[in-house]
Amino acid sequence: MSRQTATALPTGTSKCPPSQRVPALTGTTASNNDLASLFECPVCFDYVLPPILQCQSGHLVCSNCRPKLTCCPTCRGPLGSIRNLAMEKVANSVLFPCKYASSGCEITLPHTEKADHEELCEFRPYSCPCPGASCKWQGSLDAVMPHLMHQHKSITTLQGEDIVFLATDINLPGAVDWVMMQSCFGFHFMLVLEKQEKYDGHQQFFAIVQLIGTRKQAENFAYRLELNGHRRRLTWEATPRSIHEGIATAIMNSDCLVFDTSIAQLFAENGNLGINVTISMC
């Protein structure tokens, strides 16, 4: 199979855990949704979760909004620091919706699991995956590719599961990122080569692939990065990262293709470095 080659110019210096059911309130008691609505914060409309503090008149406000207020938003009375133990007991019997329910998450779960779930929820907003651009954009997963196509037009996209990622001018000083996109199997993958300069002047390169998709979707693929030339070969194989988790942690832990300047020079041609990239389905 012939490989496509494109030039990448320097750009600049789990799935949701299942809910655990708690004993349901039955008989003449209100439905779970009605009970959960009693815990809505009157300021941000998120949920007031234990420890629950009330004003002198019994009104509630969430822990995020409370430090920003000087009086109760409902009655304008003093906030006070009175624990509402009765509501805390009720909260232990309620299944709360995920804060990203409006984006499509249907999980309901005990308040003790809510924060951990929302940290990993795949319906939370995605950040722009483009490194080195200082882009602050956030949006839904479906909006990521349109954002990249309109706001980061310099990124080249190649079609096919077997391509060559050509990073130009790898001898540029300082920290530099090279980025390109690969489209295959109905998905888009972002290929990143990042050069970091350490405090002692030592430079390292980090190459990694991330899927424009969820963690669950990423588990269906594998990628191989290969430096090949002058009768030498250096290869890395792994599961692509989801843009949900990003690549910063993987690079920090060297969980990617890592090589220093001396290795790069063994494979470079006229200051340009070609990386063979192969995407396969598991």
From Swiss-Prot:
One of its GO terms (cellular component) is cytoplasm. Changing N253A: In B; does not impair its ability to interact with CACYBP and degrade CTNNB1. Zn(2+) 2 binds at C128, C135, H147, H152. Inhibited by interaction with SNCAIP (isoform 2, but not isoform 1). May be inhibited by interaction with PEG10. One of its GO terms (molecular function) is ubiquitin protein ligase activity. Changing T168A: In BURHAS; loss of function in Wnt signaling pathway. GO terms for biological process: amyloid fibril formation; anatomical structure morphogenesis; apoptotic process; axon guidance; canonical Wnt signaling pathway; nervous system development; neuron apoptotic process; positive regulation of apoptotic process. A zinc finger (SIAH-type) spans 93-153. Residues 1-22 are annotated as: Disordered. Its EC number is 2.3.2.27. Changing R233A: In C; does not impair its ability to interact with CACYBP and degrade CTNNB1. Pathway: Protein modification; protein ubiquitination. The RING-type zinc finger domain is essential for ubiquitin ligase activity. The SBD domain (substrate-binding domain) mediates the homodimerization and the interaction with substrate proteins. It is related to the TRAF family. It is linked to Buratti-Harel syndrome: An autosomal dominant neurodevelopmental disorder characterized by hypotonia apparent in early infancy, global developmental delay, delayed walking, language and speech delay, impaired intellectual development, and dysmorphic facial features. This is E3 ubiquitin-protein ligase SIAH1. It comes from Homo sapiens (Human).
